[in-house]
Curated annotation (Swiss-Prot):
<dbReference type="InterPro" id="IPR049961">
    <property type="entry name" value="ThiI_N"/>
</dbReference>
<feature type="binding site">
    <location>
        <position position="296"/>
    </location>
    <ligand>
        <name>ATP</name>
    </ligand>
</feature>
<keyword id="KW-0547">Nucleotide-binding</keyword>
<dbReference type="GO" id="GO:0052837">
    <property type="term" value="P:thiazole biosynthetic process"/>
</dbReference>
<protein>
    <recommendedName>
        <fullName>Probable tRNA sulfurtransferase</fullName>
        <ecNumber>2.8.1.4</ecNumber>
    </recommendedName>
</protein>
<dbReference type="Pfam" id="PF22025">
    <property type="entry name" value="ThiI_fer"/>
</dbReference>
<dbReference type="InterPro" id="IPR049962">
    <property type="entry name" value="THUMP_ThiI"/>
</dbReference>
<dbReference type="GO" id="GO:0140741">
    <property type="term" value="F:tRNA-uracil-4 sulfurtransferase activity"/>
</dbReference>
<dbReference type="GO" id="GO:0005829">
    <property type="term" value="C:cytosol"/>
</dbReference>
<feature type="domain" description="THUMP">
    <location>
        <begin position="61"/>
        <end position="165"/>
    </location>
</feature>
<feature type="binding site">
    <location>
        <begin position="208"/>
        <end position="209"/>
    </location>
    <ligand>
        <name>ATP</name>
    </ligand>
</feature>
<dbReference type="InterPro" id="IPR004114">
    <property type="entry name" value="THUMP_dom"/>
</dbReference>
<dbReference type="InterPro" id="IPR014729">
    <property type="entry name" value="Rossmann-like_a/b/a_fold"/>
</dbReference>
<feature type="binding site">
    <location>
        <begin position="183"/>
        <end position="184"/>
    </location>
    <ligand>
        <name>ATP</name>
    </ligand>
</feature>
<dbReference type="InterPro" id="IPR050102">
    <property type="entry name" value="tRNA_sulfurtransferase_ThiI"/>
</dbReference>
<keyword id="KW-0963">Cytoplasm</keyword>
<dbReference type="InterPro" id="IPR020536">
    <property type="entry name" value="ThiI_AANH"/>
</dbReference>
Length: 407
């Protein structure tokens, strides 16, 4: 079947009342960004749904695949736009039915938004179903569990007919919920946390703490790849890479070994807090999960959060680990996250970290050195990369150049 339109159904933005126009406009912008590089289509965003008009050469599969990853879209259907007559509907219904397997079952589902259309919903279903039974052999009706369901929408401008419904990502359009800073470690949890807040319409920038020579270039490239995967859904994402070696060495030098993890996290939070204000964000996001490790108990979270007044969002706080792994696989970050390149947190993990840190003690340990000056140096020397869905690391660029030179 050759379709001439894609029907895009909105997610939660249909509930946004007087703000709906803002959400629709943002979604249309996100769709245009996602489809950049493709041609043969025109995006038409309307109040209650979006239509994408397709030319003959449009790559419908690639367009549909990209749309399915955009937050704010509930589902997508390749559709035929048909003139508003029973004759035209019947002719297209037969074309659909001619593709049915022998002895298969079908159902006609009609939605009539145009109440002035001369036939009501049930009359249309009977008329179109009867036409199929008369002209197509060895098929039958099954309204409960059909093999095929021909869907017909009678709207004010035209009639739209389709069979397939491709699930979207749901949620709200990214760009409607403000900006946050994601603490991206390179593990399984933080990319999922980033995806969860983006699903709520939030724009993210990411921060990663890099401690060479203790952490490798591969660990850095791993985080770049995770950011690239996230960017496939929302467009370019800024990744801020913090030189953290000086701070981390000093913490491990002067802080009691059981408290180094708590103090390290507090230093990270201080750096993130300064960057939040620089980039105009309103919250910090991390992948913490209650009770999963020593730094993620309530006592630890209290001690760590104390260094900032910026809201800290933890979208995975109550998830089971297995739930997080499933989501990681769904969004495509799992295989990258489990690559064996350690970040600065895992390399310096103490043997017996405190799970219920005494707040006064950690403050006392930190009081013996001037961490504020080190934090400022770390912020001043941040490396910022803009990661797109087709971003290539320096190593990948060099490899590609060698291949081109060889050819």
């Amino acid at each position: 079947m050759k379709y001439d339109h894609l029907l895009v159904r909105y997610g939660e933005l249909t509930l946004k009342g007087s703000n709906r126009k803002k959400f629709v406009n943002q979604l249309r912008n996100n769709v245009n960004k996602s489809l950049k590089g493709l041609d043969g289509f025109v995006v038409k965003g309307k109040r209650d749904r979006m239509y994408i008009e397709l030319e003959d050469h449009a790559d419908i599969n690639e367009i549909t695949n990209r749309l399915s990853k955009i937050f704010g879209i509930k589902s997508i259907s390749p559709v035929l736009k048909v003139e508003k007559s029973i004759e035209a509907m019947s002719a297209e219904t037969i074309k659909f039915a001619q593709q049915f397997e022998e002895n298969s079952t079908f159902k006609i589902d009609v939605k009539r938004a145009d109440k002035n259309f001369p036939m009501d919903t049930y009359e249309l279903q009977r008329e179109l179903g009867g036409t199929v039974l008369k002209q197509i052999e060895n098929v039958s009706v099954n309204v409960k569990r059909p093999d095929h369901e021909i869907r017909v929408e009678v709207r004010l401008d035209a009639i739209y007919m389709y069979e397939e419904v491709v699930p979207g990502s749901g949620g709200l359009p990214v760009g409607t919920g403000g900006k946050t800073l994601l603490m991206l470690s390179g593990g399984i949890d933080s990319p999922v946390a980033g995806m969860e807040v983006m699903r709520r319409g939030v724009t993210i920038e990411a921060i990663h703490f890099h401690s060479p020579p203790f952490t490798s270039d591969q660990a850095k490239e791993k985080v770049i790849e995770l950011t690239r995967i996230l960017a496939e859904r929302v467009g370019p994402i800024k990744l801020h890479i913090v030189p953290f070696t000086e701070l981390q060495k000093q913490v491990n030098k002067v802080v009691h070994p059981r408290y180094t993890m708590t103090s390290t996290r507090r230093m990270m939070m201080r750096v993130a807090d300064k960057l939040v204000h620089q980039i105009g964000a309103y919250a910090i996001v991390n992948g913490e999960n209650l009770g999963q490790v020593a730094s993620q108990t309530l006592h630890s979270m209290y001690a760590i959060n104390n260094v900032t007044s910026t809201p800290v969002l933890r979208p995975l706080l109550t998830y089971d680990k297995e739930e997080i792994i499933i989501k990681s696989k769904e969004i495509g970050t799992f295989e990258t996250s489990i690559q064996p390149f350690e970040d600065c947190c895992t390399i310096f993990t103490p043997k017996n970290p405190v799970t219920e840190p005494n707040f006064d003690k950690v403050v006392q340990y930190e009081s013996v050195f001037d961490f504020e000056e080190m934090i400022n140096r770390a912020v001043e020397n941040i490396e910022t990369l803009e990661i797109t869905s087709d971003y290539k690391t320096i190593k990948e660029q060099q490899t590609n150049q060698l291949i081109n030179d060889f050819l």
